[in-house]
Amino acid sequence: MGVNTTLNCGACAATLIRPIGPPHAEGPRRIVAVSGGIGSGKSSVTRVLASLGAVTADADAIARQILEPGEPTLGEVARAFGDDLLREDGSLDRALLASRVFGGEGSDERVARLNAITHPVIEARAWSILRAAPQGSLAVYDIPLLVEGDHADRFDAVVIVDAPIEVRVQRLEGRGVAPEDARARIRAQASSEERRAIATIWIDNEGSADDLEEVVRLVYERWLTPDVPTFD
């Protein structure tokens, strides 16, 4: 059997760059990170893996949960960036927080300050989900800031999802993010080169949703769940 380290589906492609860790005898079969810059499509990859049976922990979803009214983390963020971030009903004005943290002079320091408050709480909740995954299952951590947190070595495989910057900006515009804000958020995150340095599997996501779903299904079936990855 020949070895082919790339899977192509339309305009999407997955490349196996480094060996995948062996399956665990107890607990989840493998614990895998899915990461990528904002607008890359990493959440879509995670959704496909979940539909195939993976247990998932979503850092972005947890980040939203810990900033809901009544959560201690919300109070810490308000103390750090201004009590006016809280509406009369106690909820967070997320748009105001984003405008205050991202972009402009000193944004790196502000982003680091926000991350220092939220990331430890997100990590603790996520890993409680991953470690509780059923015996033999695939556990997936959807985490945007994997490079920035220097956590890649904790996973059996790291799946990086990438797309050209302008494609990502267009996707964010579709979510109501202004182009200049989208570019500021992208600049505040790790570069594609930094992500490639830690990738086990690299997914180029320039195609359709169907292309992406098919390439992720192949990655799941051929690389992430077998004892040893299979190649055609």
Question: Where in this protein do the model-derived segments appear?
Answer:
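ATP-dependent NMP and nucleoside kinases share a basic, alpha-helical "lid"
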Residues: 76, 124-133, 138-174
